[in-house]
Amino acid sequence: MPDKLKYIFLLLICALGQSAFAQAPTNPNYPGNNPGQQQRRLNLNDTATTKLQSTDQQLDSLRKRMDKKRDTVVFSSKFIRVTNERLLRDSTQLFPLDTGIFNFENYSPLLQPRDPKISLGNTGRDERSLLYDPSRTIGFDAGLHTLDAYLLNPQDINYYRARVPYTQLYYISGGLKEQIFKVLHTQNVNPRLNVGFNLNFAGSQGFYSSNQVLEQNVSNVNAAAFTWYESKSKRYNLLGNLIYNNLKTPETGSILKDSIFKTGSIDKTTEQVRLPATYENWAGSGLYLKQFYYIGRIDSLKKEGGKSLNILPTQRVAYTLSYNTRKYNFIQNDADAYRVFPDYYFSSNHSRDSLSVTHLQNDFSYSFYLRSKNVRFIKNEVKLDVGLTQDYYQYSQYISDTTLNQYGNKVVQPLKVQGASFQDITLKAKLSYRLSDRIGLDGDFQQIAQGRDAGDFLYDAKLKLGGGKKAGRIIFEGYSQSSTPPLAYTNWISNHFIFHDKFKSQKTNSVSFNYINDALKLDLKAEYFLISDYLYFAAQPGGIDAHPVQLGSDINLLKVSLGKSFAWRRWHFDDFLVYQKTDYQSTIRTPEFYNYCSLYYKMFLFNVLYSNLGINVRYNTEYAAPSYATGLGQFYNGPDIKFSSYPIATIFFKATLQHTNFFVMYDYANQGLFSPGFYTVNRYPQMDHLLKFGVSWSFYN
């Protein structure tokens, strides 16, 4: 009997143990059973029961938990596409956003490697091209262009297709010497409508006479609001922008100490200038609307990679409306104690000269495309564009003069000295033929048929020959141009300069050969110019009386440029050379040789920082430096002075990290090695060495 009780007792213990284990789930996801989870204390007093859920309820609960998790999609530049008006002229083309750091440190419009400029000292001051670079426009021209590099024009606006809002902040700092800040924002309101804005600020105290002199500060503001609408059928497009420009730059007449690099200076910011409170101001605004509609069959061509399409129309009609006003002001608040001006006609110690120009343009065009239905690549395509442009201009010029009011007191009032209104009618035609994707011929013809500038023309022809990626491509081009003399050369009235002249139209004929090989990273271009009735400003020997002059002889000019990039492992060397030769070197006043080279080492630091460390060097040979006419806004041929020329070196480090690009550079790092400073314009010393910092942030949200 005791043995039977022993077995019955053992069986009861086993049954109780089984019940205890049944209350502890063996699911590894249960708190405490998964060693990877944090232990959670159980409330033994909790008597609540868990309600059983159906399969649909369990899926809903899982969906809620997934929605609460953080979105794992990383927005980047892949969600942004960009284009501009030029790329939309023939078809709808979109390109990825450029987020690289190539040429990032060359932010200034004065120091672009392939378009160097001379200036009065620093960014924001009056400038012109160092190399010969003729204008290829016809029609009315006010003749004032020394601040063109800082203007924001309708053709400078980019248009976007943004799947997410895109914002870019851009900041450059060289201390009080130079600061630039830019903001760009764009987003799609819906898949077909994009809006955005640009806002640019530039300020500079410069390097000389900047000690607590507000009038000597550069202060530039550019603002634009833009939009791009594309219909659902992709037939209708609308480009629009509103632009505002306000540029202010000092007109110092140069510093008093002409030999500052020989005698030195204790503090350059306190060096006296001839006109400490005189400046010029350009202000203007404009509206630009361009509409085009595709008629008939629409083709599409896939880009490389097949991620996006080019929309190719067979017929297109376009209309452009442009309206802008611009006012050029010269404000003199100083007595001319150091004879900056050759003369005065209305007031000896102050000037309020201004020129106001209003421009209204209506442009109509029709395009016809003839191509085969197979558009894997363009073959045997003929394109014809015809158009008509109406330009209406109204200008007025004012000075300030002292008059007697009704009470017999002397007062200074603005006085209108001239004004006119007129229109030009321009006929346009463009013919293009593409035998294949490697052979193409383009002809572009513009002729002003009626109006003030009737007779102006620009005829241009190009032949493009492609030989594949390894062989490269060749472009032959020739153009002929005749343009009416600008207003500043023929009919100008201001306090210090008055011109009433008649000149012939300036004519330019040019032919060029351009060989481009992307595989070899080679770009060779040879250009020949024949210039007749060349217009420029000059002064009497030893004088400062700048006035317009027309050369009676033809000018021959040869310009050869070569660009080449080399790479060896992580070392890279980019070089650009220009050789210019003319039979009127003292008239054109440009250097015979120019070179820009960049040597840098590519690195990938800490496995996250793509960076370049290198040096840029600019050099040009000696040339007769032009002078600058304060109050006229023109560079002119003054004393035949040549300044010694030495290389100018800049050391830089630039990098990119996720959505941020930045650089640190030491500009003019070799100052004092060859010379204590340099000139590009007579009597206007250029920048000193300066540590600069720049950063660009991109946001995609």
Task: Label each residue range with its predicted role.
Residues 1-9:
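Bacterial N-terminal signal peptides that target proteins for export
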Residues 6-7, 27-28, 559, 574:
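Generic early N-terminus positional signal peaking at residue ~5-7
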Residues 9-17:
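Bacterial N-terminal signal peptides
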Residues 10-11, 127, 598, 694:
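Generic recognition of well-ordered alpha-helical segments
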Residues 18-22:
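Sec/Tat signal peptide C-region and signal peptidase I cleavage site
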Residues 23-284, 295-311, 464-471, 684-686, ...:
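Membrane-proximal, glycine/serine-rich, low-complexity loop/turn segments characteristic
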Residues 162-164, 186, 241, 277, ...:
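Exposed, low-structure sequence patches enriched in small/polar residues
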Residues 341-346:
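N-terminal low-complexity tails
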